[in-house]
Amino acid sequence: MVAVSGTQRTRTVSLARWAVYAGSVFAGAWLATQLFYLAQIALWLFVNPGSTAFMRTDAWWLSRDTPPAQIRHQWVPYDQISRNLKRALIASEDSTFATNNGYDVDAILQAWEKNKARGRIVAGGSTITQQLARNLFLSREKSYIRKGQELIITWMLETVLDKERIFEIYLNSVEWGRGVYGAEAAARYYYKIPASRLGAWQSARLAVMLPKPRWFDAHRGSAYQAQRAAVIARRMGAAELPQSE
């Protein structure tokens, strides 16, 4: 049997104490971050978000790369956004949005299998609420840690806000090209009209852009966009909007 010296025992105890201390600090910081997110979401019951994490990051890059350029963004109330666009986004991004709890388990499992096969994260299986969680608070980085945080924020959004409010914030904050955020800015940028006047075909084409808005902004009128828009347009009639609609 090997004897343990007093010095070794003291060092072991010190390391254990530091580990407990570091763990406590980390846990406290993590909890404070979650409470900050929750408080922000609760505030949005009464006021509209001024900006999102994506907007702030984009604004920084624009100011560095093209100083005169600014973020295009104008908040408009839910009832001033075309029903065509609402239906197009649900048909394209999250067909069960009106009834799900913010998660699509089948889509998440499919994304997991796809990522495992590729050996890296290439898909996320995100619902509209998950996309909103990411846009509001997180970054474009693809990692399992970020995905875990996204799922927690999604639960907060679904718990605190109703579906119409979630969709209203999403419609006003989603990216439609570099520096273009929200339905009103997108409608005016691409079609020179307010979001309230978007037709079915225009809405379907905007919906196609969401997975890769910057790519589609640079490749407007592509054959794929037209083909995909036709598919979305056919599905729009069956898209279920939040109940108050």
UniProtKB/Swiss-Prot annotation:
* SUPFAM superfamilies, per the entry: Lysozyme-like
Q: What is its EC number?
A: 2.4.99.28
Q: What is its main location?
A: membrane
- Does this UniProt record's set of keywords contain Cell cycle? no
Q: Name the Gene Ontology molecular function terms of this record.
A: pentosyltransferase activity; peptidoglycan glycosyltransferase activity
Highest taxon in the source lineage: Bacteria
Q: Give the stretches traversing the membrane.
A: 20-42
Give the reaction(s) catalysed. Answer: [GlcNAc-(1->4)-Mur2Ac(oyl-L-Ala-gamma-D-Glu-L-Lys-D-Ala-D-Ala)](n)-di-trans,octa-cis-undecaprenyl diphosphate + beta-D-GlcNAc-(1->4)-Mur2Ac(oyl-L-Ala-gamma-D-Glu-L-Lys-D-Ala-D-Ala)-di-trans,octa-cis-undecaprenyl diphosphate = [GlcNAc-(1->4)-Mur2Ac(oyl-L-Ala-gamma-D-Glu-L-Lys-D-Ala-D-Ala)](n+1)-di-trans,octa-cis-undecaprenyl diphosphate + di-trans,octa-cis-undecaprenyl diphosphate + H(+)
Q: Which GO terms describe its biological process?
A: cell wall organization; peptidoglycan biosynthetic process; regulation of cell shape
Q: What subcellular locations does the record give?
A: Cell inner membrane
Listed GO CC annotations: peptidoglycan-based cell wall; plasma membrane
**Pathway this chain belongs to:** Cell wall biogenesis; peptidoglycan biosynthesis
Q: Which InterPro entries does the UniProt record give?
A: Glyco_trans_51, Lysozyme-like_dom_sf, PBP_transglycosylase, Pep_trsgly
**Keyword vocabulary terms for this entry:** Cell inner membrane, Cell membrane, Cell shape, Cell wall biogenesis/degradation, Glycosyltransferase, Membrane, Peptidoglycan synthesis, Transferase, Transmembrane, Transmembrane helix
Task: Tell me the Gene3D superfamilies matching this sequence.
Answer: Biosynthetic peptidoglycan transglycosylase-like (1.10.3810.10)
Membrane topology, as annotated, equals: Single-pass membrane protein
Role summary: Peptidoglycan polymerase that catalyzes glycan chain elongation from lipid-linked precursors.
> What does the similarity note say?
Belongs to the glycosyltransferase 51 family.
HAMAP family from the UniProt entry: PGT_MtgA
This one is known as: Biosynthetic peptidoglycan transglycosylase
* Source species of the chain: Burkholderia cenocepacia (strain HI2424)
